[in-house]
Design a protein with these regions (language model features):
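Gly/Ala-rich beta-loop-alpha elbow adjacent to hydrolase catalytic centers
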Residues: 28-39
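Conserved hydrolase catalytic core segment
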Residues: 41-50
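Extracytoplasmic/secreted proteins, especially bacterial periplasmic and envelope-associated proteins
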Residues: 37-38, 91-94, 158
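The feature captures the conserved acid-bearing segment of alpha/beta-hydrolase catalytic domains
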Residues: 49-148
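Gly/Ser-rich "nucleophile elbow"/oxyanion-hole loop immediately N-terminal to the catalytic nucleophile
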Residues: 2-28
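Surface-exposed acidic, glycine-flexible loop patches that form ligand/cofactor-binding
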Residues: 16-21, 44, 65-70, 169
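Catalytic active-site module of serine/aspartate enzymes centered on a nucleophile-bearing elbow/loop
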Residues: 124-186
Length: 186
């Protein structure tokens, strides 16, 4: 088991010795793109600590996002770049509102607002990706496409800490659904 092969990482926190199963309340589900969709769908059926979605979820023709959720919706947090085609095509704003995330704060541009971003669950960035929509899709996660400053530091490091560490009981002020977000995309 992981707790035996790498005990320094304290894997026991995530496993129940009583019934040899995962302690899902301690697990953070996270994914990018299709992984964001998978993480959100999983969390509707199984309560988890929180759900961190990068550049997603994108499921513009379905309505599963509005189903009852085993994981409280204030535990869902999203980040996307505004040049990502999922954003420009209104796919993300539709999914985010169907998840009810507007109840936990307005859209917040992380390039203009400092942590804790008004405690919002809906974060966007307009970081410079040289107008490359493909890079925009992947720049919000750590890796080679992530945006760095002149010293080579990730510009979204504080955002990532917020997504994974911010207390889930601290939420932003509810706002009305965005009238500019197209809900019917067929």
């Amino acid at each position: 088991s992981l707790s035996h092969t790498d005990p320094d990482w304290q894997w026991n926190e995530f496993f129940s010795t009583e019934n040899d199963s995962v302690v899902w309340d301690s697990v953070i589900m996270s994914g990018a793109s299709h992984g964001a969709t998978t993480s959100a769908r999983f969390a509707l059926h199984q309560r988890v600590d929180r759900v961190v979605m990068f550049c997603g979820p994108r499921d513009q023709y379905e309505s599963w996002q509005s189903l009852p959720s085993a994981t409280p919706k204030e535990r869902f947090i999203v980040l996307s770049h505004v040049l990502d085609t999922g954003w420009t095509g209104d796919n993300y704003c539709r999914s985010w509102e169907m998840l009810g995330l507007n109840k936990y704060g307005p859209l917040v541009d992380v390039d203009l607002v400092s942590p804790p971003f008004g405690n919002s669950r809906r974060l966007i960035t307009d970081a410079d990706v040289n107008h490359d929509e493909k890079r925009a899709h992947s720049c919000v996660t750590p890796g080679k496409a992530a945006v760095k400053d002149n010293q080579g530091r990730y510009v979204h490091a504080a955002v990532w800490r917020y997504l994974f560490d911010h207390p889930v009981d601290q939420v932003g002020q509810a706002v009305e659904p965005d009238t500019n977000c197209r809900k019917e995309l067929r």
